[in-house]
C-alpha cells in the first residue's frame, strides 16, 4: 500500500469501496502522472496540494448521489454528464427545436451543488485546460456549459481511442480564439449574400423550376470554401466533393465558380457552353443524352483558396448517397502513385474527400455504412473523409420521427469511432469553427469526421412542392424565420463592423450582378440535338491488341513469378500446384490454364506501363483457390506478391481482399478508374450471383455515365458464372441484366471458353484505357473451367494473335447441316460431348463476345455452309434469363428465313437453377443431348 496513505486518506475525498483501487492509482500517479487518466491527474494534484479539503454532503436527492458521496465526486459526475450529454441541450436548432424526453441531469442543482460551494474548488478539477484561466470551479462549469450546450454540440465520448478522446477534449475545452477578423467577417457576409441572392433570383425569375434550393443550410457554401482554404494551407491540392441535388447548383456556382451566365442558360434551355471560361480552368462534360442540371458535376482548377487546387464535384444520379464510395475511390486514386515498381504508395496529403449527405438519407441508405467501413482499411483509406450532413430535418414529406430510430441522423456514425459535431446552421462563425476542428482532427489522426449541419428547408422538396400540405406546423415557423444572410448581416451591424446601409447594398448588388449575367443570354439561342448521336470513338467494338511475344519473353516472366526470396516458405501443397506452371514452357503438351493466363497477361500489361488494381472478396487467393496472387509464408505468415517483381515492370500492381461489401466497393473502384483512367481497375465478385448487390452502380454509373455525363470508365468486372449444381444462389451472375444495359457500344460483355482468349482480352482492355475508346468490360468468369484442360491452351496461342469474338472448329463445310452457338461453360460441355460423340454435320461456335454481338463474324461463317439447315442457340440459363432474349433479334436477322432457328436450354424459371445437384445433372444432360440430336 502507498507510503502516502495518511496524506491520501486524510484528504476528505470519500472513495468508499474504491479506496484500495484509488490508492494503487495514486501510487502510479506519484511515479508517473501521465500513467493515470487526466481527470485523476487533476484530482490527485489537488490532494497533493491540499486543495481537496471539501466536506462531503451526504444526500440522496437530485443527482442520484448516495449518502457519503464527496463534493468532488459529484462535481466530476456533473462534468462527465456535460461532456457526454450536453449536446442534448445544445443550441443547435435554428427553428422548431425538438422536445427532449428523459435527458440525463446536466444542471448544478441536480447534483446538490451550488455556486458558493463550487467557488471554493479549483477550476482545475473541471478541466486541466481551465486551471490558469478561471478562478474557481463555478466559473469553469459555466464555461463548460456554454461550450457543450452552445451552437456546436460535441459527441466524442463514444470513441474507443483514448488519444483521440483526449485530443478532442483539449481542442474543445481550450478557449477558442476566433479565426475571423472584421474584414474576414465582411467577406463571409458577402459570400452568404451571394449564396442567398442566387437562390432568390432563380426563385423569382424561374418560378416553379426545380433547383433544390440550399436555403436553410446556406452556410454549407462558406463551410466548403473554408475547408478548401484550410486544405490548401496543408498543401492539399486535390479536393473531391460528392453531394446529392439539394444545394448542388449553389455549390457549382460559388465553390467551383461556374459562371452565373452558364447556370441561367441552363434554366433558359440555351447553350451554356458559350459562357465557359476560355482559360480552361473549368471542365464541364456532358454526354449525348445529358442529364438534369442538378446531377451534373465539374472540375475547377483555381487559385482562389490560397494555392492552385483542383476541385472536383462528382456527377451524381438521383439515388441519394450512392456517390459516397465513388468520391472515396476518386480520392484514393489521386493519392496513389502508380508509376513505380511494386505496389503503389499513398499520400493522404495529396487529396481529400468531402461527402455531403442528407439527414433523411444518411441513416436510411446502407451505402453510407459500407463506405464508412472502408475508412480505415489498407486498400481503401483516404486519410479521413469530411462528412457534412445538410440536416434540414425532413425527407421530402417525412419528419425524423418517421424517418429514423435514433436521436440524430448522425448516430449511425458512432459505430465507426469517429467524432460528431452538431452545429447550428444559423450561427455562421460556429460553422466555421466546426470545420476548423474537423480539419485539425483529420490532419492529426487521418480519420473521418462527421459534421451535422442543423438547419431547415425553406421551401418544399422542390420548388413546385407545397410543404404545408403535410408539414403545416413546422412551416408556420419557417416562413417567419429570417434567412442566415439577414441574421448575420444584423449581427455585424450590431457589432459595428458594417452599417445597415452597407448590409442592404451588398444584398442588392447580388441581384444586379445576376441581372447583368441574365441579360447576356439570347433566349432564342435554343439547343437542338434531337439525334443525340454517340461519339465516333464508340462506333466500333473494343479493338484487339495484336502485340506479339516471344516464347523466351513469356518464359522469363513465368520464371520470375516462381522465384521467391530464399527465406520465404511457400506452403508445400501450394508450391506443387504453382510449380506446374513451368510445364507449358518445359514439357511437351503442357498447357496454360486460366489463372496462369491471367498472371502472364497482368505481367505483360505491367511491362507496358499500365498499373493494375484488383479487389474483391478473397481476390488475393481467389474464391476458387486458383489465383494465389499473394503468397503466405507457412512459418511466419509473411506475404510475398510475385507481380511486384515482374522483369522490366513499369507500373504498380495493387491487390486487396475487400470487405464483405459489393455496392461500396464497386463504387470505389469505379471512382478510382474515373480519376485515374489509365489504371486497370478490376472488381471481382466472390460469386457472380452477389454482384446484384451493386445493381445501382451498374445501372446509374457503369452503363450510363458516358451517355449522361460524358464520364469515361474502363472498370472491369470478373463475375463467376456457370451452372454447376450449386443451387440458385451460386450459379448466375445475371448475364441478362448486363446485356439489357448494353447499348451504344457502352460496354463489352464476354463469356469465354479459352484461356488464351482471356489473355488477349485483358491486354485489349488495358490498351484501351485512357483513350476515347475505353469502356467497361464485364467478364462472366469461370469456376470449374479454371482447371479444365479444354479451356487451357498451349503457349503458342499466347505468343501471337489477338482476341477472337467467336471461336470455330475446323470442319468439312460441305457436311454441316446444323450450327450450334453457345458460350462459356455451355460451349465447353458441348465440345466435350462432341469429342466423345463425333458428328461432322454439326459446327459448334463459341460466342466469346456477347456484346457487341459479333453479327458479321457469325454471318461470314453461315455464308460458307452451303447445306446449312438449322441454327441453334444453346444456354444453361433459363429461357427468360441468360443471353437468349438478347441474341434472338440478331439471330433472327441472320437466319432471315433461310434456316430454322431453335432454342435449347432451361425453360422459363423464376429461380435461376435447381437446388439439387443430381437434378441439375439430369437437366444439363437433357439440354446437351437435345441440342445435338434435335
From Swiss-Prot:
Q: Name one GO biological process term.
A: tricarboxylic acid cycle
Enzyme Commission numbers on file: 1.2.4.2
**What are its GO cellular component terms?**
cytosol; oxoglutarate dehydrogenase complex
Q: Name the cofactor(s).
A: thiamine diphosphate
Q: Does the keyword Amino-acid biosynthesis apply?
A: no
Would the keyword Mitochondrion be found if you checked this record's keyword annotation?
no
Q: Could you tell me what reaction this enzyme catalyses?
A: N(6)-[(R)-lipoyl]-L-lysyl-[protein] + 2-oxoglutarate + H(+) = N(6)-[(R)-S(8)-succinyldihydrolipoyl]-L-lysyl-[protein] + CO2
Query: What GO molecular function annotation could you give as one example from this UniProt entry?
Result: thiamine pyrophosphate binding
Q: Which UniProt keywords apply?
A: Glycolysis, Oxidoreductase, Thiamine pyrophosphate
The text of the family note is: Belongs to the alpha-ketoglutarate dehydrogenase family.
Q: What is this protein's function per UniProt? A: E1 component of the 2-oxoglutarate dehydrogenase (OGDH) complex which catalyzes the decarboxylation of 2-oxoglutarate, the first step in the conversion of 2-oxoglutarate to succinyl-CoA and CO(2).
Oligomeric state and partners? Homodimer. Part of the 2-oxoglutarate dehydrogenase (OGDH) complex composed of E1 (2-oxoglutarate dehydrogenase), E2 (dihydrolipoamide succinyltransferase) and E3 (dihydrolipoamide dehydrogenase); the complex contains multiple copies of the three enzymatic components (E1, E2 and E3).
Protein name, as recorded: 2-oxoglutarate dehydrogenase E1 component
- Protein source organism: Staphylococcus epidermidis (strain ATCC 35984 / DSM 28319 / BCRC 17069 / CCUG 31568 / BM 3577 / RP62A)
Where is the organism placed in the taxonomic lineage, from the top?
Bacteria, Bacillati, Bacillota, Bacilli, Bacillales
Amino acid at each position: 500500500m502507498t507510503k502516502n496513505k495518511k496524506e491520501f486518506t486524510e484528504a476528505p475525498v470519500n472513495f468508499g469501496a474504491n479506496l484500495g483501487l484509488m490508492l494503487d492509482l495514486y501510487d502510479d500517479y506519484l511515479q508517473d502522472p501521465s500513467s493515470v487518466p487526466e481527470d485523476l491527474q487533476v484530482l490527485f494534484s489537488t490532494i497533493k496540494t491540499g486543495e481537496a479539503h471539501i466536506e462531503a454532503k451526504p444526500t440522496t436527492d437530485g443527482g442520484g448521489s448516495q449518502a457519503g458521496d464527496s463534493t468532488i465526486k459529484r462535481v466530476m459526475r456533473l462534468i462527465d454528464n456535460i461532456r457526454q450529454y450536453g449536446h442534448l441541450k445544445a443550441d443547435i436548432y435554428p427553428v422548431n427545436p425538438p422536445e427532449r424526453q428523459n435527458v440525463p441531469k446536466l444542471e448544478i442543482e441536480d447534483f446538490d451543488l451550488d455556486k458558493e460551494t463550487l467557488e471554493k474548488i479549483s477550476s482545475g478539477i473541471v478541466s486541466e485546460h481551465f486551471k490558469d484561466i478561471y478562478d474557481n470551479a463555478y466559473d469553469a462549469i459555466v464555461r463548460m456549459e456554454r461550450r457543450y450546450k452552445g451552437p456546436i454540440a460535441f459527441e466524442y465520448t463514444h470513441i474507443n481511442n483514448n488519444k483521440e478522446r483526449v485530443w478532442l477534449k483539449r481542442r474543445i475545452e481550450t478557449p477558442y480564439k476566433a479565426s475571423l477578423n472584421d474584414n474576414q467577417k465582411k467577406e463571409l457576409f458577402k459570400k452568404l449574400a451571394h449564396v442567398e441572392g442566387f437562390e432568390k433570383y432563380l426563385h423569382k425569375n424561374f418560378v416553379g423550376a426545380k433547383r433544390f434550393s440550399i436555403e436553410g443550410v446556406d452556410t454549407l457554401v462558406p463551410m466548403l470554401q473554408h475547408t478548401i482554404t484550410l486544405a490548401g494551407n496543408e498543401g492539399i491540392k486535390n479536393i473531391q466533393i460528392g453531394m446529392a441535388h439539394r444545394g448542388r447548383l449553389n455549390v457549382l456556382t460559388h465553390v467551383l465558380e461556374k459562371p452565373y451566365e452558364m447556370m441561367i442558360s441552363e434554366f433558359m434551355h440555351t447553350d451554356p457552353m458559350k459562357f465557359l471560361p476560355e482559360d480552361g480552368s473549368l471542365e464541364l462534360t456532358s454526354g449525348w443524352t445529358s442529364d438534369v442540371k442538378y446531377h451534373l458535376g465539374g472540375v475547377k482548377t483555381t487559385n482562389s483558396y490560397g494555392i492552385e487546387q483542383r476541385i472536383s464535384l462528382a456527377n451524381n444520379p438521383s439515388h441519394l448517397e450512392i456517390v459516397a464510395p465513388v468520391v472515396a475511390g476518386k480520392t484514393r486514386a489521386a493519392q496513389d502513385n502508380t508509376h513505380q515498381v511494386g505496389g503503389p504508395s499513398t499520400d493522404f496529403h495529396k487529396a481529400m474527400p468531402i461527402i455531403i449527405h442528407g439527414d433523411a438519407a444518411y441513416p436510411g441508405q446502407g451505402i453510407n455504412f459500407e463506405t464508412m467501413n472502408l475508412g480505415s482499411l489498407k486498400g481503401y483509406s483516404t486519410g479521413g473523409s469530411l462528412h457534412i450532413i445538410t440536416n434540414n430535418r425532413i425527407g421530402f414529406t417525412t419528419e425524423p420521427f418517421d424517418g429514423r430510430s435514433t436521436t440524430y441522423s448522425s448516430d449511425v456514425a458512432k459505430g465507426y469511432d469517429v467524432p460528431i459535431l452538431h452545429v447550428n446552421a444559423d450561427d455562421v462563425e460556429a460553422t466555421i469553427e466546426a470545420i476548423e476542428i474537423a480539419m485539425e482532427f483529420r490532419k492529426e489522426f487521418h480519420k473521418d469526421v462527421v459534421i451535422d449541419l442543423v438547419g431547415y428547408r425553406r421551401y418544399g422538396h422542390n420548388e413546385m412542392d407545397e410543404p404545408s400540405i403535410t408539414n403545416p406546423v413546422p412551416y408556420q415557423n419557417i416562413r417567419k424565420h429570417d434567412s442566415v444572410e439577414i441574421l448575420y448581416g444584423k449581427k455585424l451591424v450590431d457589432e459595428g463592423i458594417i452599417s445597415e446601409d452597407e448590409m442592404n447594398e451588398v444584398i442588392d448588388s447580388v441581384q444586379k450582378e445576376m441581372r447583368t449575367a441574365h441579360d447576356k443570354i439570347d433566349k432564342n439561342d435554343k439547343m437542338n440535338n434531337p439525334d443525340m448521336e454517340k461519339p465516333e470513338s464508340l462506333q466500333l467494338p473494343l479493338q484487339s491488341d495484336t502485340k506479339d511475344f516471344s516464347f523466351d519473353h513469356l518464359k522469363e516472366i513465368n520464371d520470375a513469378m516462381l522465384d521467391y526470396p530464399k527465406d520465404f516458405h511457400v506452403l508445400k501443397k501450394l508450391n506443387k500446384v504453382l510449380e506446374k506452371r513451368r510445364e507449358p514452357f518445359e514439357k511437351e503438351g503442357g498447357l496454360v490454364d486460366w489463372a496462369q493466363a491471367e498472371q502472364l497477361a497482368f505481367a505483360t500489361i505491367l511491362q507496358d506501363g499500365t498499373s493494375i488494381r484488383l479487389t474483391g472478396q478473397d481476390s488475393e487467393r481467389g474464391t476458387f483457390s486458383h489465383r494465389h496472387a499473394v503468397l503466405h509464408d507457412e512459418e511466419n505468415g509473411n506475404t510475398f506478391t510475385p507481380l511486384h517483381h515482374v522483369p522490366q515492370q513499369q507500373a504498380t500492381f495493387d491487390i486487396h481482399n475487400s470487405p464483405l461489401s459489393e455496392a461500396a466497393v464497386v463504387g470505389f473502384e469505379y471512382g478510382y478508374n474515373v480519376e485515374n483512367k489509365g489504371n486497370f481497375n478490376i472488381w471481382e465478385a466472390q460469386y457472380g450471383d452477389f454482384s446484384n448487390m451493386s445493381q445501382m452502380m451498374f445501372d446509374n454509373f457503369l452503363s450510363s455515365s458516358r451517355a449522361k455525363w460524358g464520364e469515361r470508365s474502363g472498370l472491369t468486372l470478373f463475375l463467376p458464372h456457370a451452372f454447376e449444381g450449386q443451387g440458385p444462389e451460386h450459379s448466375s451472375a445475371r448475364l441478362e441484366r448486363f446485356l439489357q444495359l448494353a447499348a451504344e457500344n457502352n460496354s463489352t460483355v464476354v463469356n469465354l471458353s479459352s484461356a488464351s482468349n482471356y489473355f488477349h482480352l485483358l491486354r485489349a482492355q488495358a490498351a484501351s484505357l485512357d483513350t476515347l475508346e475505353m469502356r467497361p468490360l464485364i467478364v462472366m468468369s469461370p469456376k470449374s473451367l479454371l482447371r479444365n484442360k479444354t479451356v487451357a491452351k498451349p503457349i503458342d496461342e499466347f505468343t501471337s494473335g489477338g482476341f477472337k469474338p467467336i471461336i470455330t472448329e475446323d470442319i468439312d463445310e460441305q457436311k454441316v447441316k446444323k450450327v450450334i452457338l453457345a458460350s462459356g461453360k455451355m460451349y465447353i460441355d458441348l465440345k466435350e460431348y462432341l469429342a466423345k460423340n463425333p458428328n461432322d454435320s454439326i459446327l459448334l461456335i463459341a460466342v466469346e463476345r456477347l456484346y457487341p454481338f459479333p453479327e458479321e463474324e457469325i454471318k461470314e461463317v453461315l455464308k460458307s455452309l452451303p447445306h446449312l439447315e438449322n441454327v441453334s442457340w444453346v444456354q444453361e440459363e433459363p429461357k427468360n434469363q441468360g443471353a437468349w432474349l438478347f441474341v434472338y433479334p440478331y439471330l433472327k436477322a441472320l437466319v432471315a428465313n433461310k434456316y430454322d432457328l431453335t432454342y435449347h436450354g432451361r425453360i422459363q424459371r423464376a429461380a435461376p437453377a435447381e437446388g439439387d445437384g443430381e437434378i441439375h445433372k439430369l437437366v444439363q444432360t437433357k439440354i446437351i443431348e437435345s441440342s445435338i440430336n434435335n
